Curated annotation (Swiss-Prot):
Keyword Protease: no
Organism (species): Geobacter sulfurreducens (strain ATCC 51573 / DSM 12127 / PCA)
Protein name: NADH-quinone oxidoreductase subunit K 2
One MF term in the entry's GO annotations: quinone binding
Cell compartment(s), UniProt: Cell inner membrane
PANTHER family associated with the record: NADH-UBIQUINONE OXIDOREDUCTASE CHAIN 4L, NADH-UBIQUINONE OXIDOREDUCTASE SUBUNIT ND4L
Catalytic activity: a quinone + NADH + 5 H(+)(in) = a quinol + NAD(+) + 4 H(+)(out)
Gene3D superfamilies: 1.10.287.3510
Pfam families: Oxidored_q2
Function field: NDH-1 shuttles electrons from NADH, via FMN and iron-sulfur (Fe-S) centers, to quinones in the respiratory chain. The immediate electron acceptor for the enzyme in this species is believed to be ubiquinone. Couples the redox reaction to proton translocation (for every two electrons transferred, four hydrogen ions are translocated across the cytoplasmic membrane), and thus conserves the redox energy in a proton gradient.
InterPro entries: NADH_UbQ_OxRdtase_chain4L/K, NUOK/Mnh_C1-like
Subunit structure: NDH-1 is composed of 14 different subunits. Subunits NuoA, H, J, K, L, M, N constitute the membrane sector of the complex.
Length: 102
C-alpha cells in the first residue's frame, strides 16, 4: 500500500506543529524543550523521506541519516548539560542556565 505524498506532508506538518507547541508551552523545562525539538526534527525527516519516495531519489533519505547523526550528538550534549544543571542547582529550569554564563 502506497501512502499519498500529501498525507505524509500533513502528518509531518502536524508533528512539527506538535513539537512547536511543546517548545513554546514548556520552554522553561529543558527536558520538554528537548523533546519538542526532537519531534520537530523527526517531522522534518519524515518530510524528506516522503519527498525522496515521491520523486524516487535517495537524497532525502541520505539527508535524514545526516539529521539523525546530528540529532544524536545534540541530544547527548544537551542531556549532559541538563544532568549537570540538575546536580548543581536541583532544577531543570532554563533560567538557571543563564546564571552559569561566565
Amino acid at each position: 500500500m502506497i501512502v499519498p505524498f500529501e498525507h505524509v506532508l500533513i502528518l509531518a506538518g502536524l508533528l512539527f506543529a506538535l513539537g512547536l507547541v511543546c517548545v513554546l508551552v514548556w520552554r522553561m523545562n529543558l527536558i520538554m524543550l528537548l523533546i519538542g525539538i526532537e519531534v520537530m526534527l523527526n517531522a522534518a525527516m519524515l518530510a524528506f523521506v516522503g519527498g525522496a519516495a515521491r520523486w524516487g531519489m535517495a537524497d532525502g533519505q541520505v539527508f535524514s541519516l545526516i539529521i539523525m547523526a546530528l540529532t544524536s550528538a545534540e541530544v547527548s550534549l544537551a542531556l549532559a548539560m541538563v544532568v549537570y544543571l540538575h546536580r548543581r542547582k536541583k532544577t531543570v529550569d532554563a533560567d538557571e542556565f543563564r546564571e552559569l554564563q561566565g
